[in-house]
Amino acid sequence: MLSWGYFLFLLPTLPGAQSQVQLVESGGDVRKPGDSLRLSCKGSGFTFSNYWLGWVRQAPGKALNGSLPLTPLAAAPTYIPGVSGRFTISRDNARALLHLDMSDLRPEDTGRYHCER
């Protein structure tokens, strides 16, 4: 049974840039188990609709390169085990936005979420 005193730390990373390409995440917050949260990623400096985009989770104390990709977004996203049915990735090409909607949050969802191209 989950304790209501246990909080999940779901934070987007700081904006990063390669040349003029930027992906800026927003929406991070501290939530309790069972809550929902939406993260967004705004792209600029490239033609958003021409690229596969995805989310990567960095668990506390773990290196980013050891984390699991949630999905490269194509026509039909695929999800890592444990998040299917709770996490949904969507994109709005006209506004250059990628979203990650998370519901029924669990302690193992804790981490930093990075948007990647």
From Swiss-Prot:
Query: What GO terms fall under cellular component here?
Result: extracellular region; immunoglobulin complex
Stored Gene3D superfamilies: Immunoglobulins
Q: Which intervals of the chain are annotated as region Framework-2? A: 55-68
Q: Does the keyword Disulfide bond apply?
A: yes
Give the source species.
Answer: Caiman crocodilus (Spectacled caiman)
Query: Which residue stretches belong to region Complementarity-determining-2?
Result: 69-85
Classification via InterPro entries:
Ig-like_dom, Ig-like_dom_sf, Ig-like_fold, Ig_V-set, IgHV
Traced from the root, the source organism's taxonomic lineage reads: Eukaryota, Metazoa, Chordata, Craniata, Vertebrata
- A Gene Ontology biological process annotation? adaptive immune response
Put simply, this protein is called Ig heavy chain V region E1
Name of the encoding gene: E1
